[in-house]
Amino acid sequence: MNRIPALLAAVAVILLFAGCGGSNDAGRSSAQPAPRGHLLPRDFPGWGHEAIRPVPPGLFVVTYVGPKDRRPWVIVSDTEGVPRWWFNPDTPALWGQVLRDGSLAWARSFGDGYGLDRRMAYEVRSEDGKLLRLVRTKDSIVDGHEYRELPNGNVLLDTYVPETADLRRFGGPKRAAIVSAEVQELDRAGKVVWRWNSRGHIALGETGRWWRSVLSNPRRRLRREVFDPVHINSIEPGNHGEVIISTRHTDAVYGIDRATGAIRWKLGGLPTGQSLRVVGDPATRPLGGQHDARLDRFGRLTVFDNGKDRPRRPRVVFYRLDPAGGKAIYKGQLNDPEVSRSHCCGSARELPGGGWLVSWGDNPLVTGFDQRGRIAFRLHLPASTFRAVPTPPGATSIRRLDRGLSEMESAAGP
């Protein structure tokens, strides 16, 4: 691997940042060199960090494909904008994260929208780049939208399960090939210990306004056109035996009873008997093609709301759920004035030291917010990252990442 000295790399990054065109609320910007003792690869892509306000120290992961050479990158950065670890997978990575034991996991990506390619898997690697294992769902191809660690060491994954449905009332074929959304919980040995499928729980009618897009954008599988009426994109363990999922093609987030499989509540989308009444939200339709529904440390539901085809900017929106009272109470939102639209993708995660980290989907921008909801930094990337994911507290350190980089460099040779 060709490398250049960190000082020259810093100069290169500064020049690349100058072409980003981003505003600077505090009137200052910074672009950071490689970690001490390391050389940035010569082909390291453009990287512009805009420092605006102080932010607690922390680490996070971004992934993207270089726009010029199409080379995939998994990068761990600190909140000061210094790349601390990087890796070039053999296939593009949809998104990545540091796991609680310090290993890194990312979803392979083959540009198919969801899991259609049998090579699909989550790669789990050590900090020195060694492949530890591949993780896949059972009975159908794993999808790349979710890999959620649980406290007991199990993981929640999603898969898109093929089936047949009559879509004539929506303008589709009589015997259409579709995919339903399935959640699987796998133990450490890869055994499925719990699963749930949207079949019989999310009606095809809930796809609503998305049917035109779904029917006009099928995927091909086994020489057939396959339609995706649900499109699950996140899974989150909830409270009181609940699992929370986000499904883009229904504009909704659902709370699922693990014991019965029944839907306890629904937020957004077309109204059903489980729908929550939204209180106080300035948006008349609360969600639009949303992603990354999570519970924060205060128990609030947080959602990256793309606002797809809605008359508003993308936002991170907060709700206090009251299923017993049948309502969801709006608790605020975050925006970045540099982002006016978001067709897909995106994430919103709490920073361990306080504040929020937001990937704006198909925009090449990550924004850090402080605890008061003010923009603390922007990371301008050469291409979009599906998610930006903070590392769990205590999972790894700059020293460990530095050691892993050193071992990879030694193995690669001069």
Model-derived features: positions:
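Bacterial signal peptide processing site
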Residues: 21-23
